[in-house]
């Protein structure tokens, strides 16, 4: 159910004029997609007991470290600890995650992390939106094996591939 909702939201993002006008290499002023997805999870995810905001944040940060070579994420007190550190091209920042018990706080923490790493990224091939989608996908997979999000580009390709019609055989 959540996958269908997220696919629908991706479709809406494709057709939304405000999102179409975004710069493809936009900086992390705000993570619009993250906020929308977290609101969908809060409102529509059926199994509320599976939603663990801090664990979702940790999963997302681990994915961030995997896909962005320059970023290192460390949990000095373990993944259940009160802080985490993010290092990017020699710069390091410590973030508090002791009070992360709500999906709105997860969004806020991710915004802080993206605001920190974005100016230091040197790989021009990486787009902030692609990184955001990958992080979100990992966070949603922590809910259950069927939850995830796809990028608007992949969704658009999927819809084109499944588009079409069947003709009759000419039998009366």
Q: What annotation goes with each model-predicted range?
A:
Residues 1-172:
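Flexible, low-complexity junctional segments that flank or bridge functional domains
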């Amino acid at each position: 159910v959540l996958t269908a909702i997220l696919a629908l939201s991706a479709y809406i993002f494709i057709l939304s004029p405000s999102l179409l006008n975004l710069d493809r290499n936009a900086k992390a002023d705000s993570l619009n997609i993250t906020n929308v997805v977290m609101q969908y999870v809060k409102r529509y995810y059926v199994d509320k007991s599976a939603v663990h905001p801090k664990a979702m944040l940790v999963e997302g940060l681990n994915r961030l470290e995997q896909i962005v070579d320059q970023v290192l994420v460390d949990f000095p007190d373990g993944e259940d600890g009160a802080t985490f550190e993010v290092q990017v091209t020699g710069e390091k920042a410590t973030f508090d995650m002791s009070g992360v018990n709500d999906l709105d706080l997860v969004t806020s923490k991710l915004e802080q992390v993206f605001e920190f790493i974005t100016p230091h990224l040197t790989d021009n091939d990486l787009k902030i939106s692609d990184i955001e989608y990958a992080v979100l996908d990992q966070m949603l997979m922590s809910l259950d094996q069927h939850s995830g999000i796809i990028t608007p580009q992949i969704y658009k390709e999927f819809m084109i591939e499944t588009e079409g019609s069947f003709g009759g055989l000419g039998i009366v």
